[in-house]
UniProtKB/Swiss-Prot annotation:
Protein name per its UniProtKB record: Probable aminotransferase ACS12
UniProt function note: Probable aminotransferase. Does not have 1-aminocyclopropane-1-carboxylate synthase (ACS) activity, suggesting that it is not involved in ethylene biosynthesis.
Residues spanning the signal sequence: none
Lineage, broadest ranks: Eukaryota, Viridiplantae, Streptophyta, Embryophyta, Tracheophyta
N6-(pyridoxal phosphate)lysine sites (modified residues): 334
Pfam families: Aminotran_1_2 (PF00155)
EC code: 2.6.1.-
Cofactor: pyridoxal 5'-phosphate
Keyword Nuclease included in the entry's annotation: no
Length: 495
């Protein structure tokens, strides 16, 4: 009661202020003193485990489990089980070199060309710096490459691309730069088109065999599926309307919504060139079914046969069809042999597709410095005409040597007229005419013959024994080495 009275005095404002404030402080002090005396003495720090402190502090969270990434990233992070990527990775571990590693794996799985590097080397050495000089006085202007530029590509580059594409396609079609979006290679081009033309879970019809990279380019982020349209060697793997109809009906029965048709012309991996009639049939079919058409024409300038190349842009511009459903992919990786420049094109007659692609290019635009170089390169008409003539001739010559070498071994190839590869029939070397037999041969080629060739299984070919062999990065002296390795492997099967 004596303790409470002074406190009450404080509350009521009537005296006892000092005593009422002092008593609680004293009580708190004596309580601390009592607890301190009864506290056990501290342990010697040297008795503590050495591994305690930071290590133990962080290890306490281990029971929670490993931090997770998104469900989108998990399948992308996993190693691919496609023979196409398996072969490419194996070559990296033991690459062939005619001087330093003559027993290494020879790369026939990558469609790139070194045939005209001498011409590119000369042009770059003479024009590279000048192509970056943007001022009238010839001085370097940093603002021309350092400032923000349109994500869809500089207008000068789109104009140069339009002229270049028309030139390599025989001048039979003109391209409008306003329908064009510059991309960082063909991969972003196909992905952006898939994003624009199909919803997640929709599908594209795609004739087989097809380029294995399409699975990666389309499925990784867009969620769009690919439905194979099976073609056969009896038609030189050329797509037909009946095959498209059958694939579409089967897709609808499974509940899949088909949004378009995707194909390569010239075909990759076969190398055949689609005729004007076939292109009309495809577009007519798409119009009847109200779906889109995506024509990958990245090998348009790598045609070396007698057949005429016809762009789908020419068919769309004939006036017979609804051209807004036509979209074209192009790039410089193959025809100009500069995949490292990462330069591609989306060409579309659909205004919404072009506008959407322009905005999406903020994620994969081409560096301005590269664009400046390409403007000069593509605008050099004299160089381009000489280069393309040499490019086609050198592909033709290399193709003849490679196919003739296989022919002498009794190994035929499909008829082709474009691309940096040939479609080789190795079914005579199979231990069993099946997918399993083909994969066994793929492994033997890789480990015994030390040759990486892409098996048809990776391209969704339904006929076992076909392999894609890319030959435009080979030196002439490499071809006899390849043929000898295949010969020895074939003889080991017979013994």
């Amino acid at each position: 009661m004596r303790l409470i009275v002074p406190l009450r005095g404080v509350i009521q404002g009537r005296g006892g202020l000092f005593v009422g404030s002092l008593i609680p402080c004293c009580l708190f002090y004596f309580l601390q003193l009592y607890l301190k005396r009864r506290r056990p003495p501290p342990s010697d720090p040297t008795d503590l485990p050495r591994t305690f402190s930071r290590t133990n502090l962080f290890s306490r969270g281990n029971s929670i489990g490993r931090v997770r990434v998104s469900s989108r990233a998990v399948p992308v992070a996993k190693p691919s089980d496609s023979p196409y990527y398996i072969g490419l990775e194996r070559v990296k571990t033991d690459p062939y070199d005619r001087i330093t590693n003559t027993d290494g794996i020879i790369q026939l799985g990558l469609a790139e060309s070194t045939l005209c590097f001498d011409l590119l080397q000369r042009w770059m050495s003479e024009n590279l710096m000048e192509s970056m000089m943007q001022s009238d006085d010839g001085e370097f202007d940093i603002s021309s490459i350092a400032m923000y530029k349109p994500f869809e590509g500089l207008l000068e580059l789109r104009v140069a691309f339009a002229d270049f594409m028309s030139r390599i396609m025989g001048g039979n079609v003109s391209f409008d730069p306003s329908n064009m979006v510059i991309t960082a290679g063909g991969t972003p081009a196909i992905e952006v088109l898939a994003f624009c033309l199909a919803d997640h879970g929709n599908a594209f019809l795609i004739p087989t065999p097809y380029y294995p990279g399409f699975d990666r380019d389309i499925k990784f982020r867009t969620g769009v599926e690919l439905i194979p349209v099976h073609c056969r060697s009896s038609d030189n793997f050329t797509v037909t309307v009946s095959a498209l109809e059958q694939a579409l009906n089967q897709a609808r029965k499974r509940g899949s919504k088909v949004s378009g048709i995707l194909f390569s012309n010239p075909s990759n991996p076969v190398g055949n060139i689609l005729s004007r009639e076939t292109l009309c049939d495809i577009l007519r079919f798409a119009q009847e079914k109200n779906i889109h058409v995506i024509s990958d024409e990245i090998f348009a300038g790598s045609v070396y046969g007698d057949k005429e190349f016809v762009s789908m842009a020419e068919i769309a511009g004939s006036g017979e069809f609804d051209k807004t459903r036509v979209h074209i992919i192009y790039g410089l990786s193959k025809d100009l042999s500069i995949p490292g420049f990462r330069a591609g094109v989306i060409y579309s007659f659909h205004e919404d597709v072009v506008n959407a692609a322009k905005k999406l290019m903020r994620f994969s635009s081409v560096p301005v410095l590269v664009q400046r170089i390409l403007i000069s390169l593509l605008s050099d008409v004299r160089f381009i005409e000489g280069y393309m003539a040499a490019h086609r001739q050198r592909i033709r010559d290399k193709h003849i040597r490679f196919v003739e070498g296989l022919k002498q071994l009794g190994i035929p190839c499909a008829e082709s007229g474009g691309g940096l590869y040939c479609w080789v029939d190795m079914s005579s070397l199979l231990t069993s005419y099946s997918e399993k037999g083909e994969l066994e041969l793929f492994e033997k080629l890789l480990t015994v013959a030390k040759i990486n060739a892409t098996p048809g299984t990776a391209c969704y070919c339904i006929e076992p024994g076909w392999f894609r062999c890319c030959f435009t990065a080979l030196a002439d002296e490499d071809i006899p080495v390849i043929m000898e390795r295949i010969r020895q492997l074939a003889e080991s099967f017979r013994s």
